[in-house]
Amino acid sequence: MASVDEGGRRRPRLAASLQISPGPWKPSGGQEPTEAGDAAPRTAEHGVAGAQEAHREACKALGGSVLSPGPAGDFPGALHGLSMLPKDPPPAQAVALLTQCMANLGVSLTFLEDQTAGPGSSFSVCADLDGLVCPAGTGSSKLEAKQQAALSALQYIQKQLERPEPLVTPRQPLLTSLSIETILTHEQRCAAVVSAGLDRLLSESSPYQACKGTVAAVILEREVQGSIGHSKETYELVALGTGSSSCAGWLEFSGRRLHDCHGLVIARRALLRFFFRQLLLVTQGGPKGQERSVLTPQPGPGPPFALKPGVFLHLYVSNTPKGAAHDIYLPLASEDSVLHSPAFRLQAHVCGQLKPVSYVAPALRDTHVGCLSASDKLARWAILGLGGGLLAHFLPPLYATSLVLADPCHDPSTLNRVIHSRPRLDSVLGSCLPCPYVRTTLHLFAGPLVAPSDPGPSTCHSLSLNWSLGDPDIEVVDVATGRVKTDSSVGPPSRLCKAAFLSAFRQVARALEKPQLLSLQTYEAAKAVPYREARQQLSLLLDQQGLGAWPSKPLVGKFRH
């Protein structure tokens, strides 16, 4: 069974007793066995006969027996067959090839139709490889979407085979059927779904390949019951962002410009877009939408919805968050002395430079874009959650369970203190934060990179990409303008801008028939009162403890449309 922390949030099974995990996780010897029958692939349209037919189709299409059928769990033989697969098989044979691959590996396969994009949109299907949800394939028909999903899964498998170390020691007795959980650790699974998602969204010839080096993402984990009652987890990429800079110009007050285009910030904004979509799915999608949504109605006086039990959020970040976490020489000392270290104070990106907020002149702060560092925002999200003020009307605080940092040069101890020690919350008198806001612990992991972190000179330094589950493609934002990149001088607003979120907020309010929310005139006024109070109290604590005042920009949120 998975453990539960004090806040009721289940810790990742692979990190049940860890708060910092700089080394590789190794599976425990007490893993529950899997029924032999569970080794056969489970698909929506393929049984045993279907797998045999799929193999015949694949062999016929590729002119020979590329994947010879063998007993489920014949891992060495399956590896040899997989290494002979064509790099880019025809879409028409992808489903057959994937089915036979999984049969030989003893890994269950299920094709899941995804309707989060809503009625009238293209079909979307994803492949579930024994708990690992691969990026969705889309198409004008279910068959086309399924073929694209199979291609994506095959690309992931081939990528794993190209790793220098084997996925599993061939001499290891395979007493149980292989599953993704026994092949990959938590941090590897997070990196795998991010890597597969990037490969799906960016072709090898894409001019934005270099943007992968700054990727950050949010992975949604669902705990599901296996065939004999044991639990397993599925991992799915739901939000993604890239970028390494912010807009350096004047403040914009219409809500149509993205000021901060750092990868982690963009991924979090893409997550907000995902949850607004989920709210529409659960309210307007009927019984099927309620079943597919990750949200469930919540009785009582609080927010009307909450995450379903067994659903968790994980962050993946390629680079050490800018700001305090970058100072790997931060001395180990008492909490009070560390808090007063200059490197520990709030820092902001202003006019292309990262500097302590106390060094920013008020005239500059009130007129120019100033964005707090990613280190500071992680500390804020550990208390206020990822959801922000608009979603707070509909959902309780959305806290991430873990953070996988792929930068090999980061210092785990510094990162932990940067996130969890600022500001200091009084354990005797209480934090004075309004309910339900509390500081939560992010379980930290060192994970693998999905792309070179420093690809060299590139035009991508001035661009930011974003995507969330349900979007047909990535959106490319010009950091200098904070708008979508186009050939014209000024592009359209991004789908992640404040004005877009205010529109989504009103759409959900109408769906829930809440006229009191529709009467809120401006973006700032639309933020839930408990959230605003918690944000104000957090800013006060930071200032009182000498860490700097959280920059307030009330005029930025005064727009109405």
UniProtKB/Swiss-Prot annotation:
Instruction: Give its localization.
Output: Nucleus; Cytoplasm
Residues covered by the DRBM domain: 90-159
Stored PROSITE patterns? A_DEAMIN_EDITASE (PS50141), DS_RBD (PS50137)
List the expressing tissues. Testis-specific (at protein level).
Q: Which InterPro entries match?
A: A_deamin, dsRBD_dom
The processes (GO biological process) annotated in the record are: RNA processing; spermatid development
**Highest taxon above the source species:** Eukaryota
UniProt signal peptide: none
User: Main localisation, per the record?
Assistant: nucleus
Q: Which Pfam families match?
A: A_deamin, dsrm
Keywords assigned by UniProt, alphabetized = Cytoplasm, Differentiation, Nucleus, RNA-binding, Spermatogenesis
Domain A to I editase as annotated: residue spans: 239-560
List the GO molecular function terms.
adenosine deaminase activity; RNA binding
Q: Name one GO cellular component term.
A: cytoplasm
The disulfide bridges present are none
Record carries keyword Cytoplasm: yes
Could you say what a knockout of this gene produces? Male mice are sterile and show defects in germ-cell development.
**Stretches the record annotates as Disordered:** 1-53
Entry similarity comment:
Belongs to the ADAD family.
- Biological role stated in the UniProt entry: Required for male fertility and normal male germ cell differentiation.
State the protein's name.
Adenosine deaminase domain-containing protein 2
Organism listed in the record: Mus musculus (Mouse)
